[in-house]
Design a protein with these regions (language model features):
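Alpha/beta-hydrolase superfamily serine-hydrolase fold, recognizing
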Residues: 1-194
């Protein structure tokens, strides 16, 4: 994936974050926001244009990328409101409140109020960068529903969003489409980056 993107002229930085349940989801979101702020401040040293930061993620990474769309975090990390120029979300969860009611919450440790605060679908900005969304055609119903729901919600609020159709990938191999410059997902990503 990184090779195809760098061949197309995109500088790629990979963020690391503490995995759950070692950290809470709120702590992980803070880590990702902090990493973006660090990248913004140090981009020049790595040949990265800090005014063209786009963030993408798959599964939990799709959720974390979407958590960068809200309006409330940038001032706390001393970055411009529009630090993020685009988001790529692959099979992400955008409203995590349903997770409070299933077994996975034993290690997520979420309560309803936290889940609402950590749901990008419930924190839509008045303006925002373009978002490209995709869920694999062989994905489970829940991830497909979350992707379609977030797409519809952004459209309804007049926020720039593009849904990329995919019929042949599942939750685990969808990201491989970014290694193929001929794929619709790669092309949509490059269109967003500009």
């Amino acid at each position: 994936m990184a090779h195809a993107l760098t061949q197309a002229g995109v500088a790629v930085a990979v963020l690391e974050y503490t995995l759950l349940p070692e950290a809470t989801l709120a702590e992980v979101v803070r880590e990702v926001r902090s990493a973006v702020a660090w990248l913004y401040r140090h981009a020049g040293a790595y040949g990265i244009d800090r005014d063209r930061i786009h963030v993408g993620g798959s599964s939990a990474g799709g959720h974390l990328a979407a958590m960068l769309l809200g309006d409330a975090w940038q001032s706390r990390f001393n970055v411009p409101q529009d630090v993020i120029k685009g988001i790529l979300g692959l099979s992400g969860l955008y409203d995590i409140r349903p997770l409070c009611d299933i077994g996975v919450n034993e290690w997520l440790r979420l309560h309803d109020e936290q889940a609402a605060l950590l749901s990008p679908a419930l924190d839509l900005p008045l303006q925002g960068p373009p978002v490209v969304l995709c869920a694999g055609g062989l994905e489970t119903t829940g991830f497909k529903h979350q992707t379609l729901y977030f797409h519809a919600l952004r459209e309804e609020h007049g926020l720039p969003v593009r849904l990329v159709e995919n019929t042949h990938n599942n939750h685990f191999n969808l990201v491989n489409e970014l290694a193929n410059p001929q794929s619709a997902l790669f092309q949509a990503t490059m269109d967003m980056i500009g």
